[in-house]
Amino acid sequence: MSAKAVAAAVALSFGISAEAQNSTSSPYSMYGLGIYSPKEDVAAAGLGHSGIALAPSEWLNISNPAGISKLDSLSFYFNVNLKGFYSHEESGYESASVYSGNIDGISLGFRGRKWLSFAIGYAPFTSVGYKIYQEKTITGSGEKYKVEYSGSGGLSQAYFDAAFTLFKHWSIGGNFSVLWGTIERLEVNYFSSANGGEDIYNKTKYQANNIYWEVGTQFDFNIGKNNFRFGATYAPEMWLHTSYDQTIYNNVSRELESDDSTPFRFHVPRMYGVGLTYQRNKVLGTIECKIAEWSKVEDNKFRYTANFRDTYTVSGGIQYSPGSPDKPFYARMRYRIGYTYGRNYVDLYNCNLIEKGLTLGITVPIGRSLNAITIAYEHQKRGTQSAGLVEERISSFKIGFNVREIWFMKHKFE
């Protein structure tokens, strides 16, 4: 792919990303900032969303800022990731199905020096997308009317990663991100269906932004012919500059009330994780644990409030590589399988909202070049039908277009 083609793809992708926010249909996204989206490449998604202890030379590992330290010094890397999903949601009373898709991230990177690598990109940070109906009764008359709750939007991040190789087996990395986004929540009371009255719309638009940073490290060591890599990441508690505009109007577009809030702060929790990778010959295995201290975050500024719990996620995966990049087509394919298990941060009726999923992945090379297409599939279960809550079963696909071009080779002329 030529430099002009890469530049065009970057411009097109950033144009798409401005509209790509609804990466979920979960009713649990109505609380706080929505469903958290890990910053990762499609290859890591196929390994159960595990990337803290990975440092590949074939693709950009953005799960750990130190994970780009092993990039090829002659190559330029560029990735565009897309996502599509189908979600079936079921409670004890009814069920619904939703499908959607959008862009899931853009990244590019290169190795500037023997000891220094860079990556920049765009990725979703949180996603909001839900539509819920409820039936209520008018006090006194006993007439019933329908209420609709819906929301959309989320936060995005534009990031810059740098990885430093301090010694042969030890690297550190830093991530600097700008977070921004809009979350819209709408509540509609359909009084016209009960007594012919006016439908009342209550619309709230939240806007949030600030900087965000994360650090990471990786350390390689060998035991005989077995290769190991330890990885760790840490992101401190941050806060977002947040404000909202609220408008109440009826079904004839007549504004009844409006309110502009005083800016307030919403905290993003402290997050940290550790991972370990084992590799011997053609097989790689990785396992990791991530924790986020959501219990210290107060959610009293949003319309729909909930208690938050600390989250934990344990995940791992196995990759099989038949051959090296200079081998025939079939030998350059990569096969992955993974599993993830964790707890959502929303606490409703003292129920643990467990999230677990099985992942599969494959990388298919394009011709004789270093470019490839990476695909990851996940079947995930989130939530429970206990206490009148919703259980979600989600099938999602991610596809990544991985461009790796030799840009920095010096040619000799006679």
Regions found by a protein language model. Name each.
Residues 1-7:
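Bacterial N-terminal signal peptides that target proteins for export
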Residues 7-8, 27:
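Short helix-onset patch at the extreme N-terminus, typifying the N->h transition
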Residues 15-17:
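N-terminal signal peptide c-region/cleavage motif recognized by signal peptidases
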Residues 11-13, 56:
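Short N-terminal alpha-helical targeting/association segments
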